[in-house]
Design a protein with these regions (language model features):
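Short, well-ordered beta-to-alpha junction loops that form the rim of enzyme active sites
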Residues: 147-149
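Active-site cleft segment of glycoside hydrolase catalytic domains centered on the general acid/base Glu
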Residues: 154-155
Length: 155
């Protein structure tokens, strides 16, 4: 075989294969196989995927579901507006996901508060717990992490 003929045939064959491959790319560009759900119930929180889903909390939830997550954890849920909480609850329900834990934060976590026995701390804590029950109803939560504050080290 002559070198010139070999190079021509190889060039022609490569061009045909490249064209065939390039034509098949648009056919699969829109299709994306959904990720299988995790066997363990991992629950990421908002902000973990903000670069992959920059459109806000709903887009992040959709991205989480697309990646196979079945739950959400949000330690700052109590600080979100009622509208955001309702939107999160509806979106979780629409995606077949569920709300994982959120934090019941009485606001005095970094000082000795509830264990002092002072009524003002108890009142704030009970008020926060009552508000948390309403938040749990809005987002469909069954679990919460209660943070009552430091304990009295002198006891």
């Amino acid at each position: 075989m002559e070198r010139r003929g070999f190079i021509k045939r190889m060039g022609l064959g490569s061009a045909i294969l490249s064209a065939a491959g390039a034509m098949s790319i648009p056919a699969f560009a829109g299709e994306k196989a959904p990720a299988p759900t995790f066997k363990m119930d991992f629950a990421p929180h908002f902000g973990m995927f903000k670069n992959s889903a920059p459109g806000g909390i709903v887009d992040e939830l959709k991205f989480m579901a697309d990646q196979g997550f079945r739950s959400l954890e949000d330690n700052g849920m109590l600080r979100r507006s009622v509208a955001d909480q309702e939107l999160i609850g509806k979106t979780l329900n629409d995606l077949g996901m569920r709300m994982g834990v959120f934090v019941i934060d009485g606001g005095d976590n970094w000082k000795v508060s509830l264990t002092t026995g002072k009524q003002e701390f108890l009142d704030v804590f009970l008020k926060t717990c009552r508000e948390s029950v309403e938040v749990a109803k809005r987002v469909g939560a069954k679990w919460a992490t209660v943070v009552p504050g430091y304990f009295e080290r002198n006891l």
